[in-house]
Amino acid sequence: MDHLPIFCQLRDRDCLIVGGGDVAERKARLLLEAGARLTINALTFIPQFTVWANEGMLTLVEGPFDETLLDSCWLAIAATDDDTVNQRVSDAAESRRIFCNVVDAPKAASFIMPSIIDRSPLMVAVSSGGTSPVLARLLREKLESLLPQHLGQVARYAGQLRARVKKQFATMGERRRFWEKFFVNDRLAQSLANADEKAVNATTERLFSEPLDHRGEVVLVGAGPGDAGLLTLKGLQQIQQADIVVYDRLVSDDIMNLVRRDADRVFVGKRAGYHCVPQEEINQILLREAQKGKRVVRLKGGDPFIFGRGGEELETLCHAGIPFSVVPGITAASGCSAYSGIPLTHRDYAQSVRLVTGHLKTGGELDWENLAAEKQTLVFYMGLNQAATIQEKLIAFGMQADMPVALVENGTSVKQRVVHGVLTQLGELAQQVESPALIIVGRVVGLRDKLNWFSNY
């Protein structure tokens, strides 16, 4: 270990930054957030320093480096564009046994600045020891996506409850189980973020009163249309916290690779026409695992409330009194159309969009007359096997035979393929693609050649 990670208490303590440019400004911002009494010594200053000085937030000392400014300091930073000056600052600080950071010169510094994730009072610091700041930044960005913004509020509130937890729960094991429930309770976190004191108190009392081995919960998470980058931050956080993930065939391998490593995984293989596990059995899996006290994530492709049968699954849980929540996802219509260069609405061509299932219950029938109307875009989910019927019905109810159509296979993924033509060719085009695929019908499809961007990468 080349460096010892420590967190410094700088509030109301004198610190010095030598340099008045953009880099110095970034360092100053961090020290000000930490509550330091800050002096800036430089030949010239960018405007932000003048603003801060006028507000009484720091002191400016114009002129060459004055090492006597270090005499009362706890910490110094050399942030000029002159290596000689930076080395002088480092040497002067070293002689006074003051920790000094030298920007872009870790060997000349007695401490280095990490990349910081601030969820005060929770702080996470990432460092490459000065060898690769870009790598540290990339890791910080990844960690940022895993840590909810409201985590700091939850941590502060936890501090207020520590004495009560210690009094109510006699053993370390009981306290650990309580805190595990506490920190993954989405309702509590949201109530704290909304400053809803009544809801916070109600949720807290419920956490204290329910048995530690209480029933678990189910989180219905939309995985998006395929590209792992389209998974929402909240969705990512949920699959990282899951004890068990129940997932469909439409959830990509890239997304499953983001699931917590020690979480159990149950594949139920649902896709239009390929039901590996009956819906009722899926409902029972969710119920059974939640009743064991597990945190269950039901991971579905797209959005769980748009042709995902999410409502049916939650009705079962609701009837059994199992707590649940829903994390929306980017639905396939939105993702696939965007990655195909097909806007779903456009002032000149479509004032509305209809999301339509091509997989009806036995005896069901669509409202073909309204679907055939002008100035709208139709997106058919699970319609591949019904493409010929869709073509026939739309033409029969008055849609123009030359209406542009597109079929998007494996949308938003590296395997995406788009075939397009006109309505009279829809049945034939459907023979050229495989599920999962969407059918898009409307004049907006004609914009694809101009707006297509994804196939260029």
UniProtKB/Swiss-Prot annotation:
- Does Lyase appear among the keywords? yes
Pathway assignment: Cofactor biosynthesis; adenosylcobalamin biosynthesis; precorrin-2 from uroporphyrinogen III: step 1/1; Cofactor biosynthesis; adenosylcobalamin biosynthesis; sirohydrochlorin from precorrin-2: step 1/1; Porphyrin-containing compound metabolism; siroheme biosynthesis; precorrin-2 from uroporphyrinogen III: step 1/1; Porphyrin-containing compound metabolism; siroheme biosynthesis; siroheme from sirohydrochlorin: step 1/1
Which reaction does this chain catalyze? uroporphyrinogen III + 2 S-adenosyl-L-methionine = precorrin-2 + 2 S-adenosyl-L-homocysteine + H(+); precorrin-2 + NAD(+) = sirohydrochlorin + NADH + 2 H(+); siroheme + 2 H(+) = sirohydrochlorin + Fe(2+)
> Any idea of its EC number?
2.1.1.107, 1.3.1.76, 4.99.1.4
Please describe what this protein does. Answer: Then it catalyzes the NAD-dependent ring dehydrogenation of precorrin-2 to yield sirohydrochlorin. Finally, it catalyzes the ferrochelation of sirohydrochlorin to yield siroheme.
Family statement drawn from the similarity comment of this UniProt entry: In the N-terminal section; belongs to the precorrin-2 dehydrogenase / sirohydrochlorin ferrochelatase family.
Q: What is this protein called?
A: Siroheme synthase
Annotated source species: Salmonella heidelberg (strain SL476)
